[in-house]
Swiss-Prot record:
One of its GO terms (cellular component) is nuclear pore. The keyword Transport applies. Residues 32-43, 196-210, 295-314, 456-473, 588-597 have a biased composition (Polar residues). It comes from Schizosaccharomyces pombe (strain 972 / ATCC 24843). GO terms for biological process: intracellular mRNA localization; mRNA export from nucleus in response to heat stress; NLS-bearing protein import into nucleus; poly(A)+ mRNA export from nucleus; positive regulation of mitotic recombination-dependent replication fork processing; telomere tethering at nuclear periphery. This is Nucleoporin nup60. Residues 19-31, 375-397, 664-692 have a biased composition (Basic and acidic residues).
Length: 736
């Protein structure tokens, strides 16, 4: 069994000194001897050495040292023979590793080419190579291969650490036959150097081509370099050995600080496609504390290249420990709960915060269960209180007016009239300047019955006072008697603070006074019909406000009215009597109503503070009536009266109100149309501050005067006595 190439022995002294088992060295002229080539060791010893790595290292050291070139010509010395004997034993073992005809042929060729190798390629720089290439190329155009070769040379020249590996340096390293053949083929191509020569250096430019697969199995022994984590994807360094497919698959080595990687399990793939349909992965216990934890980092699908790493790991945010995180969460929950409790202390249902239900030992990526969260949510959401629908009784009260009076209240008013007489007596001292006594004609035996109807007030333009709408209805009387001329005044007093449903407005409408000798033209209507009037009342001046508050009911929101009548002395002129003496006023708080009367005695004169202005118009049939008796201070013209008239009432004092108002009265005919309108004005003398007299019109109405409490001027009334029916409505403000 031959273990090496056939060698010819040199005839001489050296050949005689060798034993038959020594390695035969080659002669100087290259001829080989035909002696025996018995191996010095047995087969078992050589097999044992072949399996041990120590023999490999010895063979590498032999091939790396220049043995052949140094001792090829020195065969005469004894030291050379001993050296060759030692080498022969080593090469005999190594020859078992390379025991193929291809390797034997390759070794012979390698010796021939190594002697002929020149260092011209090694010494040339990229600039020299390009200069030589373009000097040979001249003006001929470049093809695609030449362009790529030039670009690769320029890229090498740009990187300072890139250099061409010399063939001499490759001889000093141990190479397998296949690797040596590859390096021989690469060294033969000088015009197109491969970019792989600089693949071990990390300073390549991004323009270099990618020449590796997605997951190369190359191994990089440089563990101490931390630049591998920040390498750009376009670099030519070998792939970093990290576990991309979980801890089950083995890799050449694993880093101690691991990152969670995407897994190819169906659950992980479903997370990447639809993260909301699955649970988030839990944080690993072995994960380092200096790596930031992000829930969205597990839902990213990895790319084909393993070098695409997130650059956020360069400056990781240090997360606190679990004990510190639990303390911070407890403090944060207390701070969030404190303002919500203080703000909602009065409310019975205070929404608890979500932080109070989270465990302080919970991990950052783990939330509460859906079932528990659904139980918390209804308590945190406070339902708005539903608006209570008003009942039918409330809507009826709102739709109807507050100032609605029924005839059933009138007997109660008559029964309790005497109890409120003391209230009118207390006001006598305040109205002494307006006291005045006149004789009233005795009224007819009719009981005054009033009914009030209050439709909704409609005012087009706002005004400082407020006006109210009232209708007074009374049953018709069977018999009517024309009454003589009676000087009576009719006025309304409104309180300073009126109910919200009522409104009063001021209309100053001055009308010329009629002549004293003018007769009264009255239209009468069929029996049972009422008289409709539109009333607007306004308060004017501080005195009016003072008098209005006196007659205002304490707790009732109903409007307060005061009816006054001025009676004259029988068959006597009262031209100089302008002072009115106030008397007791009978009022009823339940109805907000007050009646009064006053007499005007002769010889007394006093300046009234204010008078009421009324303008009345009636539409009735026109029977002729005797002319009214005209007094100097009171003038009545065209006053429409109903078919029911009253006899002159007894003398009884009443209180005079101070207000300025305008009354317009309209009465429709039986056919439903207004046939005729007549204005009736009654003027009263009014003294200003200098003593001058001013006339203001007043309407004249006949009505029944109630008796006083002390029994003076009492008039007996029966339950069958009736009063005329009046209807009042709101009059819109007129602007002159």
């Amino acid at each position: 069994m031959s273990s090496g190439p056939i060698r010819t022995l040199h005839k001489g002294k050296a050949a005689r000194n060798r034993t038959p088992y020594d390695r035969i060295a080659a002669s100087k002229d290259g001829n080989h001897s035909n002696g025996p080539q018995t191996p010095s060791k047995s087969i078992f010893q050589r097999a044992k050495e072949w399996l041990t790595p120590s023999s490999w290292k010895k063979a590498i050291s032999i091939f790396s040292s220049p043995v052949v070139n140094k001792h090829e010509d020195s065969f005469d010395s004894k030291t050379d023979e001993e050296y060759l004997q030692n080498v022969s034993t080593t090469t005999e073992d190594v020859s078992m590793l390379i025991n193929t005809p291809v390797t034997e042929k390759y070794e012979q060729e390698h010796r021939d080419t190594s002697a002929q190798a020149t260092p011209s390629i090694v010494e040339q720089s990229p600039n020299q190579m390009l200069a030589n290439f373009f000097s040979k190329k001249g003006k001929t155009p470049l093809n695609e291969i030449e362009k790529e070769g030039i670009i690769s040379i320029l890229n090498k020249s740009a990187s300072p650490s890139s250099s061409v590996i010399s063939p001499a340096a490759s001889l000093n390293r141990f190479q397998t036959p296949r690797a040596a053949a590859i390096s021989k083929r690469e060294s033969g191509v000088s015009s197109e150097p491969r970019a792989r020569t600089s693949s071990l250096t990390p300073g390549n430019t991004p323009n270099s081509a990618k020449q590796w697969s997605a997951f190369r199995s190359t191994f990089s022994p440089l563990r101490e370099q931390d630049q591998l984590s920040t390498i750009s994807p376009n670099s030519l360094l070998p792939a970093q050995r990290l576990s991309y497919y979980g801890p089950t698959l083995s890799t050449p080595y694993n880093r101690r600080l691991r990152h969670k990687r995407h897994s190819t399990t169906p659950i992980s793939l479903s997370n990447s496609i639809a993260p909301s349909l699955s649970f988030q992965p839990k944080k690993a216990r072995y994960e380092s504390a200096n790596v930031s934890f992000n829930d969205t980092s597990f839902t990213n699908v990895p790319t084909s290249s393993p070098l695409h790493q997130s650059t956020t790991a360069n400056h990781p945010e240090k997360t606190p420990s679990r004990a510190a995180a639990s303390l911070l969460s407890i403090l944060d929950s207390k701070e969030k709960n404190t303002p919500s409790i203080t703000a909602k202390a009065g409310s019975p249902q205070s929404a608890p915060s979500k932080a109070s239900y989270i465990s302080p030992y919970a991990r950052p990526g783990i939330t509460t269960s859906r079932r528990r969260h659904d139980q918390i949510r209804p308590s945190s959401e406070k339902s708005e209180p539903e608006k209570k629908e008003p009942s039918a009784f409330e809507t009826l009260e709102k739709s109807s007016n507050v100032q609605t009076y029924k005839p059933s209240l009138m007997p109660e008013f008559l029964e309790k009239a005497s109890t409120h007489g003391s209230f009118a007596k207390q006001k006598e001292g305040e109205q002494t300047s307006l006291s005045e006594k006149t004789a009233l004609s005795e009224p007819e035996n009719k009981t005054p019955v009033f009914s009030f109807k209050a439709p909704s007030a409609t005012t087009d333009k706002p005004s400082p006072p407020v006006s109210s709408i009232f209708s007074f209805n009374a049953p018709s009387a069977a018999s009517t008697k024309p009454s003589p001329a009676v000087s009576s005044t009719f006025s309304f007093n409104a309180p300073t603070t009126t109910p919200s449903a009522t409104s009063f407005s001021i209309i100053n409408k001055e009308k010329p006074a009629r002549s004293p000798n003018e007769t009264i033209d009255v239209d009468l209507e069929e029996e049972g019909s009422g008289i409709s009037a539109e009333v607007e009342v306004a308060n004017e001046g501080e005195d009016l406000q003072k008098n209005a508050t006196e007659v205002k009911a304490s707790t009732s929101e109903k409007p307060v009215f005061r009816f006054e009548a001025v009676t004259d002395e029988k068959n006597s002129e009262v031209s100089s009597s302008n002072q009115a003496s106030s008397s007791t006023m009978i009022s009823q708080p339940n109805t907000g109503f007050s009646f009064g009367s006053f007499n005007k005695p002769a010889g007394q004169e006093e300046k009234p503070q204010q008078r009421s202005l009324f303008s009345a118009s009636f539409t009735t049939q026109k029977p002729e009536l005797p002319a009214a008796k005209i007094e100097p201070e009171v003038q009545m013209t065209n006053v429409a009266i109903d078919q029911r008239s009253f006899e002159q009432a007894e003398k009884s004092p009443i209180s005079v109100s101070e207000s300025t108002s305008l009354v317009e009265v309209e009465k429709p005919s039986a056919e439903g149309t207004n046939e005729h309108k007549q204005d009736a004005t009654m003027t009263l003398e009014k003294t200003d501050k200098q003593g001058s007299l001013e006339e203001e019109p007043f309407p004249k109405f006949s009505f029944t005067v109630l008796p006083k409490e002390n029994g003076e001027n009492l008039s007996t009334m029966e339950s069958t006595q009736e009063l005329p029916k009046f209807s009042f409505s709101v009059l819109k403000e007129e602007k002159n």
